[in-house]
Amino acid sequence: MKNFKQLLVMFLGIFLFACEDDPAEVVEIVVTPPATYTFERDGQSTVSFSGQSARLEMAAELGTWLNTPMKTAAELDAMFNDGTGFGNPALAASGKKLGNKTASSSIASSTVKPQFDALIVDVTSNVFPNVANDASAGTPGTYTDPGGRTVIINGKGHEINQLFIKGLMGALVCDQIIWQYLSTGKLDGGTNVADNDAGTLVDGKSYTTMEHYWDEGFGYLYGLDTDLNTAEVEGGSSGGDVLVSKYMNKVNTSSLPGISQEIYDAFKHGRAAIVAGAYDVRDEQAEIVKTKLSHIIGRKAADYLKSGADKIDDGKWADAHHALSEGWGFILSLQFTKNPDTGSPYYSNAEVNSMLADIDDFWTVAPADLRSMATSIESKFGF
């Protein structure tokens, strides 16, 4: 009997040791994204991005007024920094603003937001008072190509509304999506992971904080879309968003075919991963969004530089000023992209400022230099 007890103890010890030695079973979470960006809880939609829709609408109207010599600097400043003075009274009532979300992430240089404020001063002090004058090198005013485009520009040929709006492509949209709402620091901040795992909802809402942050990132691209059931942003090309979704549509049918679907699918997949608690999948999809958005910025920066060079060669100066003004804004935006190989922007703030200085005077910049800069951008992005 004594020997039996000893054998039993030895057997139990070996059994327990073997159990402890077995590796814990890893349960893989399978994430199945929905066909459309539709997510519900208890019959209620959990998707909300009204603040982003408001800011996109603000940007569209502000862009119009920056090219219409009727507003004062104070009025334009109020629209940008205070969120007031818009034709739609609901925008002011929303409490949302563009200025406080412009170049506001931790990677943004503190010098960028003042550049936008300076553009408001420039257009109201130099351009608007001189629209009755014929523009020329060093002289602000209006320039019209024979039988073609008309632009109102400063003495360097800058069409201010284009610099401003194209600059918001990066300083607002990419900065908010890439460096804030889809960043792990934002998504996983505080108790967000534990709350999402437990299904703890924001007070009075149908969504968790993590779900909402992801949706807000989504909203900076799709906030004015009239049909979220497709990858195409229906409001992005006419009468809707004037920011990144408009140019996503453009490159989707030309130089970056299929990019709209890739971004839309990644947003859907990442949001489904949040619902499932599969944060590794979420992060993989976030990186797809960040890389593809960055490619849009890089592609258009190069495109407008080349277009500007071609228009100068053709003697179409109004077209050249317009294209280079758009290019200026997209170059400014390069510092808000993300290179997946380095985890940093494709271009630093210092590099961007150097590039802007090189093309500063649109009347005198050499087409060869514009094409060289475009080629350099294409090379860095791997186009």
Regions found by a protein language model. Give the residues of each.
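Sec-dependent signal peptide recognition
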Residues: 2-10
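Mature extracytoplasmic or organellar-lumen-exposed domains after removal of signal/transit peptides
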Residues: 26-383
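C-terminal motif of bacterial Sec signal peptides marking the signal peptidase cleavage site
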Residues: 15-18
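Detector for intrinsically disordered, low-structure N-terminal pre-sequences
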Residues: 8, 25-26
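Bacterial signal peptide processing site
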Residues: 20-23
